[in-house]
Curated annotation (Swiss-Prot):
Superkingdom assignment: Eukaryota
Name of the protein in question: Deoxyribonuclease TATDN3
Needed co-factor(s): Mn(2+); Ca(2+); Mg(2+); Zn(2+)
Source organism phylogeny: Eukaryota, Metazoa, Chordata, Craniata, Vertebrata
Mutagenesis or variant effect for E107A: Reduces AP endodeoxyribonuclease and 3'-exonuclease activities
UniProt family annotation: Belongs to the metallo-dependent hydrolases superfamily. TatD-type hydrolase family.
GN (gene name): TATDN3
Length: 274
């Protein structure tokens, strides 16, 4: 394996998505050719846990697994709903089964979009599901890979209240001032290729110190073009845009963000050296 410091780490992607069922080998080969050294594969629901673990075996040391229960469950767009504690109860025994092989717990978090969490009860149940998963991560000494759509401040507040330490806030959509509260708590923020079409993400990157930034694609979502399948090799778009905003070289962005990923995910260094 190449030295951990020289390649790109995609800190958040959905390789178990049906979008990749037909050509995942090709997609991953393209990523390797684009100097991607690790893909952090996150889960949304218990139904994809086995698939993610199988991918991590098949692409050992390249696809690194995270298991967790996302705040939005069900299939888009018609059947999506806010998470319940029952969803978590189904997932927990499977997570326990694989705990020693996990890089992190994720994708977990809060999603207060009105169509998913229109009531106080739904928001509270999301909070309870997140609290239990933060407690699980702490017990297993694992980082958390976090979703916070329309819930930036409540998510950061809850993470702090629960004493979460190693935290990645993926594709953060809140205000830079709220993100800076996360920076002060030692959290990292991962930036997807959709930054090239998002004024909010561009403002965020201007404010965030490079030492708090990681790279992600969120593949197959959040690509450079809307409605076009995103792929891990597009991660270079994030690196290039951050370099442009910060007025530094792409090489420096890659080096620092990969070092950040190694700090965030302690198991990563060992896995990259396999």
């Amino acid at each position: 394996m190449r030295a951990a410091g020289v390649g790109l780490v995609d800190c958040h992607c959905h390789l178990s998505a049906p979008d990749f069922d037909r050509d995942l080998d090709d997609v991953l080969e393209k990523a390797k050719k684009a100097n991607v050294v690790a893909l952090v594969a996150v889960a949304e629901h218990s139904g994809e846990f086995e698939k993610i673990m199988q991918l991590s075996e098949r692409y050992n040391g390249f696809v690194l697994p995270c298991l967790g229960v996302h705040p939005v469950q069900g299939l888009p767009p018609e059947d999506q709903r806010s998470v319940t504690l029952k969803d978590l109860d189904v997932a927990l025994p499977i997570i326990e089964n694989y705990k020693d092989r996990l890089l992190a717990i994720g994708e977990v978090g809060l999603d207060f979009s009105p169509r998913f969490a229109g009531t106080g009860e739904q928001k509270e149940e999301q909070r309870q599901v997140l609290i239990r998963q933060i407690q699980l991560a702490k017990r297993l000494n694992l980082p958390v890979n976090v979703h916070s759509r329309s819930a930036g401040r409540p998510t950061i507040n809850l993470l702090q209240e629960q004493g979460a330490e190693k935290v990645l806030l993926h594709a953060f959509d809140g205000r830079p001032s709220v993100a800076m509260e996360g920076v002060r708590a030692g959290y990292f923020f991962s930036i997807p290729p959709s930054i090239i079409r998002s004024g909010q993400k561009q403002k965020l990157v201007k404010q965030l110190p490079l030492t708090s930034i990681c790279l992600e694609t969120d593949s197959p979502a959040l690509g450079p073009e809307k409605q076009v399948r995103n792929e891990p090799w597009n991660i270079s778009i994030s690196a290039e845009y951050i370099a442009q905003v910060k007025g530094i070289s792409v090489e420096e962005v890659i080096e620092v963000t990969t070092q950040n990923a190694l700090k965030l995910f302690p198991k990563l260094r060992h896995l990259l050296q396999k």
